[in-house]
Swiss-Prot record:
Name of the encoding gene: murD
GO molecular function terms noted in the UniProt entry: ATP binding; UDP-N-acetylmuramoylalanine-D-glutamate ligase activity
Name this protein carries in UniProt: UDP-N-acetylmuramoylalanine--D-glutamate ligase
Residues reported to bind ATP: G109, S110, V111, G112, K113, S114, T115
Entries under Pfam families matching the protein: Mur_ligase_C, Mur_ligase_M, MurD_N
Catalysed reactions listed for this entry: UDP-N-acetyl-alpha-D-muramoyl-L-alanine + D-glutamate + ATP = UDP-N-acetyl-alpha-D-muramoyl-L-alanyl-D-glutamate + ADP + phosphate + H(+)
Biological role stated in the UniProt entry: Cell wall formation. Catalyzes the addition of glutamate to the nucleotide precursor UDP-N-acetylmuramoyl-L-alanine (UMA).
Amino acid sequence: MQYALLGLGLSNKYAAKFLLKLGEKIFVSESGKLSSEDKAFLEENNIPYEEGVNSEKILEADVILTSPSVPHNHPILLKAQQMGKYVDTEITYFMKFLDWKPKIIAVTGSVGKSTTVAMINHLISKSASSQISGNFGIPIAQVLLEGKKPEYIVVEISSFQLYWTPFFKPNVAVITNIYPNHLDWHPSMEHYVDSKFKITKFQDNEDHFVYNPKDMETFKRLALVQAKRVPFTVDFKFEEIPFHIRTKQNMENIAAAKTVLKVLGLPFSMSMLEDFTPLPHRMEYCGTINGAHYYNDSKATNAAAVVKALENFDNNLYLIIAGKGKNEDYSKLANEISKKCKFVAIVGPISDAVEPYLKERNVNYKRFSNIEEAVFEISKMAKEGDYVLLGPAGASYDAYKNFEERGNHFKEIVKKLMQG
């Protein structure tokens, strides 16, 4: 069989390695630039490739595995679909090769999915073998190459990956919540929600669908779900959560993880999370300067995620919004800001989108040309008992490689200021 890999990110690199092992023919098409390391790998393995372009040579393949972020209306992929070619992404395509039949738990959602995946994996691993895969963790092709054969695979899957997949049937599907997100990629909110709901589209009544009963977008489509429907609810007190992960966001994340464990028939107790390592860039404490506490929430890349983060604060907050917006409505975020924030710093392209909402509500704000300037000015204003939050509400690509690089830069700035 002939394969074309559209984009050579981490998942398609492992796809290439696994397909080589099977002796399949591969062609790689990368619209950007390939690193010298990638070129060396392709040349060593006699894999033909092109860079700086996606040509019609892709259409010679029987199966096209695309990088998830490739636009949904990419002309080559539209043509491939018209020609009846099989288009998929690495994560769902290689599921069929998992011959030891592990249980697949798949998680999607606009906010909290990575933490929920990490918690589910942590809790399962107390009593069984488990591996995180997908968007976060290692690619499915890498799981196959490593040959460890875990009993459970916990997969984080995005709306992009779900949009591209022709078939995906996890044993347990989880939607944490659905808020407007990625509307710079999806042409409409409906397109986004339809993509999310593909997580349960091919499930039957042998499978389980774990959902948030408070989420309106999920609720509207519940009747379409063929799997056994299991709502997750917060049936514990905030104070019961281990202190190091005690945030408002984690109440729902823990409730979802606990429900998945119940569905799988595995043990759960809150004490099992005592040694859970929280993920960086999610309400991550960075330090205290002049009595003001600094938090890095660089992963909050949309308005809804920042609204969630604001639930942790009273009205003593300095907020930094930064990055590239996603074509969202900022009314709800601006309403929360007007109640909670003493001052808002806005940085980058998102400033133009957010500024009118802040002006309308008489919020005290100022534009800055970068995060460093914003933190420096805030450090002169924030006093004992105040909080400073990097809650970007936008993607990082305007100034950084990814949200991790942005969060690490923020942490470095805070560290420098702490050292005086």
